[in-house]
Amino acid sequence: MKRQYKNTKKEFLGACFLGIVALFSLTIWHVINRTSKNKSYKVFVEFDSAYGIQEGTSVRLRGLPIGKVVGISQSSHSILTRIEIQSCNTIIPKTSLIETNQTGLLNDTIIDIVPFTTLNQEYHSLKEGPLSKTCDSNQIICHLNYLQGERGLNYDDLIRATTRISQRFDDPELFYGLYYLIGNMLKLSSNLVDCTEYMASISHFLGYK
């Protein structure tokens, strides 16, 4: 009886030990897998001007946030930004438009990435990811790639254009030119009305005859 009890106890302890080892292994695998999925990568994007970009500026892909600006350096002719993409699973085609835009009531600056092409799932670089040593920068944007950004929608340009238009309307020469044109159009329309009435009276007279 005692021997049977000891055997049962050993089997129970062995099962508990195996369960603990399995649970520990599963936890380690989950942590490693999660860490690898969330591993970020960085790219450099050059702009002609800052356009309101600062550290923390949001980076979006097709309208969804995927990263942020983590560094800015200035040269004599351009601004170089260092962008961190939050997950290495975010694959960006190399043929993409990178531009600054302003949004919201406060005109917050964001960086939009708009892909021009759709990636083939069979691409080797797509399977390996941007952090791979064999990443093909001709297909996708790889870790530490150097890219050129452009200027997109900017409310300062809109305000400047509106100001120029208002200044044009304040120009006396333009005002008198429009006044003269409107006067001639009114005279022409009056003459057309008189001509139409005259033709109508002639037609009525001929019909009466």
Swiss-Prot record:
What InterPro entries does the record tag this protein with? Answer: Mce/MlaD, TGD2-like
Q: Which gene encodes it?
A: ycf22
Protein name per UniProt: Uncharacterized protein ycf22
What are the entry keywords? Chloroplast, Plastid
GO CC terms: chloroplast inner membrane
Annotated compartments = Plastid, Chloroplast
Q: What is its main location?
A: plastid
What would you give as a GO molecular function for this chain, any one?
phospholipid binding
**Species name:** Porphyra purpurea (Red seaweed)
